């Protein structure tokens, strides 16, 4: 039944007027149970019909297990926004650590050279060197051990990828 509903939604999206329709949001929980092989084209094409597709899964390994690793990578690339909560498997954490990007940092090294005071002209020289280092923004361990209700989020705004950052869930009080 879930696949039928998803195929019906896909059909409805493709009937929309490209680039001029209002935005529509499709949310699919536990989506590995409902997807089908051509789903990868749907997530790419849905953008021009202004359909936003949000999916949730326990692990991306479900995709690789069912359809293969390349299919999984194709889907992950097609989904432009990514949100990862803690307590994921180390395998998923490694994958998302790479997907969420890298950052450059610079390490300073200092050296000193001293000419013995017993020489005619004792001298002390010091210098600094800088080395560029590229590292993942969030290591697998930082992804796994995030604070409760904290998520690593990477989004695209106006076709520009925004670097990953960690956000805290802001729940609506029960009184509301």
Pin down the residues of each PLM region.
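Conserved P-loop NTPase motor cores
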Residues: 1-127, 166-173
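Conserved P-loop NTPase motor module
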Residues: 108-176
